[in-house]
UniProtKB/Swiss-Prot annotation:
Organism lineage string: Bacteria, Pseudomonadati, Pseudomonadota, Gammaproteobacteria, Enterobacterales
The family this protein is said to belong to: Belongs to the enolase family.
Alphabetical list of InterPro entries matching this protein: Enolase, Enolase-like_C_sf, Enolase-like_N, Enolase_C, Enolase_CS, Enolase_N
Subcellular location: Cytoplasm; Secreted; Cell surface
Annotated catalytic residues: E209 (proton donor), K343 (proton acceptor)
Binding annotation for (2R)-2-phosphoglycerate: Q167, K343, R372, S373, K394
Name of encoding gene: eno
Role played: Catalyzes the reversible conversion of 2-phosphoglycerate (2-PG) into phosphoenolpyruvate (PEP). It is essential for the degradation of carbohydrates via glycolysis.
Protein name, UniProt field: Enolase
Length: 434
């Protein structure tokens, strides 16, 4: 009942209007799994490689017909009659078939879409939700928790066409007792911010991840506007709401000058100066999480930042670790950061993603499951966060259905499990938040 009978791949459109890969895995008994791959804008140099056609006559070279044909003509043959419930075996067949370190032969976008579709089909064959199947693969059957969301409300950097340098300004509703309540709080603050921007005559257009994308004078102005928006609600900043930022510092770093350049403010910092700039922001505002606060290759800068801030702030490695357990192990050994951002397509298979999560947890590093800026309606990361009890999720703002699809799936899962079987720990999930 769980043998793979056929795999069908197709080219679909992501949230930025770019092509991506969708795979459909069919099993004996009529069970089907459907999954698609997301795509990033600010990417780590060591991420698994997306395969693009490079044909400028189609989709400005971003087509994925080559990846689709590799699934239909190679991966489907290699996986035919294999047991979909053996996720690790399936993923390693694809890894071996690819034969490269960064999945450049078949493409991480091709491999991931199949990997997730296999997991969904296997879950269907066991007549269980995806999150429950993931927990079983993860060797933690029946163990679940609901994640605290990082809700993006202002977009900057590569995620928006504005002059804000920091890529994401997020809120975390720490006083919420359930995921559903945290989502409601996020919606209310999102709308309060929209009204405030209108009052100020500012743009309420949104960026790639659904947060507002106004032109502002500085990163501090973004934090001040968020602070003012929260004051218009019944919630208190610091008590009910804490802040998180994603610097995406690799996008700010000039390797030749060894400087971090905030172009919107016309300021440059050395590595240490940038850490102290972030330290001052965290002293002025209740920031509990900073992601990619240094360039991905500036490990010395990350080590210094961890010494300065790691005991009081969640320091998250995204481009730094690229969901790679081996790179993460090196970071753990050196004492760099204290948390990891998990993105399925950075590594390219569900199995390797689970290995990275396990490695982080064993080292007492925080885990945040994340979307990408180019998303689809696929809500697998919601199930991944619950099935691995990862504690936090970052999946954009309260607009754009490619973002809200994940929040809505969390609401369904929480309703299905109930708080007894899937507790919501809120603030306790944030590393170094006390």
């Amino acid at each position: 009942m769980s043998k793979i009978t056929k795999i069908i791949a197709r080219e679909i459109i992501d949230s930025r209007g770019n092509p991506t890969v969708e795979s459909e895995v069919h099993l004996e008994g009529g069970f089907v799994g459907l999954a698609s791959s997301p795509s990033g804008a600010s990417t780590g140099s060591l991420e698994a490689l997306e395969l693009r056609d490079e044909n400028k006559d189609r989709f400005m070279g971003k087509g994925v017909e080559k990846a689709v044909s590799l699934i239909n003509e190679k991966i489907s043959i290699a996986l035919k009659n294999k047991n979909a419930r053996n996720q690790s075996d399936i993923d390693h067949i694809m890894i071996d078939l690819d034969g490269t370190i960064n999945k450049s032969k078949l493409g991480a976008n091709a491999i991931l879409s199949v990997s997730l579709a296999v997991a969904k089909a296997a879950a269907a064959s066991k007549r269980m939700p995806l999150y429950a199947h993931i927990a079983e693969i993860n060797e933690t059957p029946g163990v679940f928790s609901m994640p605290l969301p990082m809700i993006n409300i202002i977009n900057g950097g590569k995620h928006a066409n504005n002059n804000i340098d920091i890529q994401e300004f997020m809120i975390q509703p720490i006083s919420a007792k359930t995921v559903k309540e945290s989502i409601r709080i996020g919606c209310e603050i999102f709308h309060a911010l929209g009204e405030l921007l209108k009052e100020k005559g500012m743009s309420t257009t949104v960026g790639d991840e659904g947060g507002y994308a106004p032109n502002l004078k500085s990163n501090e102005e973004a934090l001040n506007i968020i602070q003012d928006a929260i004051q218009k609600t019944k919630y208190k900043l610091g008590q009910d709401i804490r802040l998180a930022i994603d610097c995406a510092a690799s996008e700010l770093y000039n390797k030749n000058e060894k400087k971090y350049n905030l172009k919107g403010e016309n300021i440059s910092f050395s590595s240490k100066e940038f850490t102290h700039y972030l330290e001052k922001l965290s002293q002025k505002y209740p920031i509990v999480s900073i992601e990619d606060g240094q360039d991905e290759s500036d490990w010395e800068g990350f080590l210094y930042q961890t010494h300065v801030l790691g005991h009081k702030i969640q320091l998250v490695g995204d481009d730094l670790f690229v969901t790679n357990k081996n790179i993460l192990k090196k970071g753990i050994k050196k004492g760099i950061a204290n948390s990891i951002l998990i993105k399925l397509n950075q590594i390219g298979t569900l199995t390797e993603t689970l290995e990275a999560i396990k490695t982080a947890k064993q080292a007492n590093y925080g885990v945040i499951i994340s979307h990408r800026s180019g998303e689809t309606e696929d809500a697998s990361i919601a199930d991944l966060s619950v099935g691995t009890s990862s504690g936090q999720i970052k999946t954009g703002s309260m607009s754009r259905s490619d973002r809200t699809s994940k929040y809505n799936q969390l609401i369904r899962i929480e309703e299905n499990l109930g708080t007894k079987y899937a507790p919501f720990h809120g603030l306790r999930e944030i590393k170094s938040a006390f």
